Amino acid sequence: MENSPDSPQPLELGVAAGRVSPPEGRRRGGREAEDGPAGRAVDSGGQGAAAAAARSSLGDPTSPSQLGCGAGSDLKDGASSSPAASEVPSRGQHKVTASPELAEAAAGRGSGPVGDTGTCRVEQAAEEPSSTGAPSSSCSEPSPPGDSPSLDSLESFSNLHSFPSSSEFNSEEGAETRVPEDVEEGAAGPPRAAPLCKEEEEDPAQVLAASKERFPGQSVYHIKWIQWKEENTPIITQNENGPCPLLAILNVLLLAWKVKLPPMMEIITAEQLMEYLGDYMLEAKPKEISEIQRVNYEQNMSDAMAILHKLQTGLDVNVRFTGVRVFEYTPECIVFDLLDIPLYHGWLVDPQIDDIVKAVGNCSYNQLVEKIISCKQSDNSQLVSEGFVAEQFLNNTATQLTYHGLCELTSTVQEGELCVFFRNNHFSTMTKYKGQLYLLVTDQGFLTEEKIVWESLHNVDGDGNFCDSEFHLRPPSDPETVYKGQQDQIDQDYLMALSLQQEQQSQEINWEQIPEGISDLELAKKLQEEEDRRASQYYQEQEQAQAVVTTTTPSTQAQQGQPAQASPSSIKQPGNSERKRKEPREKDKEKEKEKNSCVIL
């Protein structure tokens, strides 16, 4: 057969060995479908069918390390068993393992044999129609040299390695005979994030360990489920306090219900987040636009894909001090434009301070730093003064938020708007509720705190109030949950420790060695410590004396009660006891008379 642009081309060794990742197959499918004469595969959904047909023809990978199309293992096993079993079935056939009858039928249809170990040739029947314009296999022929890369097919995802496939989260048994359901049912939609379907059935700890083994060096994030507008909604928490715009963007899409995760999913990897984001960017492509708008959109998509991997670490955002939405134009800002997510900052110059306005002007942050360096080296005193004022402005607003900027943010952000806020080189999800700005709490330390979802942004110091998902202030701990006896014991222990500490400090003070130049404050502190020590010692002595009295009183009463207990007749003869009570009284009266008589003498 003569090689023509439409005829299949020989596969490379890397393809036969199973080193082609699913995103490459997806990119090639999108590129050929868009540039081909059959129409746009992305718009019509042919890309998903092509990817599904590719998976059905080559089988799912059977090990975590085998992330490609998996053709190498099938061809090697087929070559060792029978020559006919190494044939690659054409599109439309769902079984992967080739029986002798299937091999004979394939040989009768004219499928090409396998050549050397380095290359293989896949030929399909000329009479088979192609309704969708998508390639018949993920291991398809390379694009012609004159082809321009399609910008809506995730062309720049090569630096993200390969996304996890669904077989990595399923059992390895029966991987060769599994038939994708989307091929049988004729599903034509774009591929969704399949690897997350089994998360809800597996132990999160096992999934976390498996994810770290399969994707070494990748970040794993925990998911917190909240009740957002009466809907069970997930948000991604952050394990490290670093610049991570990926989480801020995904949380905006999750709160807006534009991206959905499987129910009760608890962990997710960074690569899976990138896959969700890439799928949404493809779905959000405008359908009916003019040719000029389409070219502009494709250029923006190309620029966004080139920096998409930076979302995991940080974006180079260069703010201007004149407006809350004024940034220097960089490719990093195109991502927010494509996703239609507003990006704000609050690092503004107060227009009422003329010298700062004159020193800063319309400079961006990078330009202002360069201006400060040049002004310091200048011989002009006016330039030196401007550089000093600009440097003071940066030092005084190190939190990257001013009160003027906070006021502008409050008036600019729309009610209920979900956006991304840039401050302290960190990206946060922000919204506005009843005229008050709130930042989404994504710290992993609050993963189990269901009542802590938002934090108010009402000053530049960063000491906001925590609120729940309905923007109610977090109530204090329930008094019933605090054990009173335990709290009393804690208070007593604290007072005892404080008393012992004060006593020890007072004993260490040597009043004879007090320097003459001691200040009044230090002398007053020492006197107060001595007074506290004496007071505590006095109270301790009082308590000990009271304890001695309480212990001696029962003993004396017991000694007085022994004679009464010794005579059993005292109980039966009440008259005798009355006489005994009267006798001491009479003796006391006689003594008083004797005293009085002595006084008269």
Swiss-Prot record:
PTM sites of type Phosphothreonine: 62
Family: Belongs to the MINDY deubiquitinase family. FAM63 subfamily.
Known catalytic reactions: Thiol-dependent hydrolysis of ester, thioester, amide, peptide and isopeptide bonds formed by the C-terminal Gly of ubiquitin (a 76-residue protein attached to proteins as an intracellular targeting signal)
Name recorded for this polypeptide: Ubiquitin carboxyl-terminal hydrolase MINDY-2
Annotated site residues (Ubiquitin-binding) in this chain: 520, 523-524, 527
Protein's job: Hydrolase that can remove 'Lys-48'-linked conjugated ubiquitin from proteins. Can also bind to polyubiquitin chains of different linkage types, including 'Lys-6', 'Lys-11', 'Lys-29', 'Lys-33' and 'Lys-63'. May play a regulatory role at the level of protein turnover.
Single GO BP term: proteolysis
Active site: 244 (nucleophile), 426 (proton acceptor)
One of the record's GO molecular function terms: K48-linked deubiquitinase activity
Sequence ranges of Basic and acidic residues compositional bias: 24-34, 577-601
Region ranges (Disordered): 1-205, 534-601
Entry EC number(s): 3.4.19.12
Modified residues (Phosphoserine): 82
Record keywords, A-Z: Hydrolase, Phosphoprotein, Protease, Thiol protease, Ubl conjugation pathway
Stretches with biased composition (Low complexity): 127-141, 148-169, 186-195, 536-570
Record-annotated disulphide pairs: none
Gene Ontology CC: one annotated term: nucleoplasm
Sequence segments annotated as region (Ubiquitin-binding domain (UBD)): 485-537
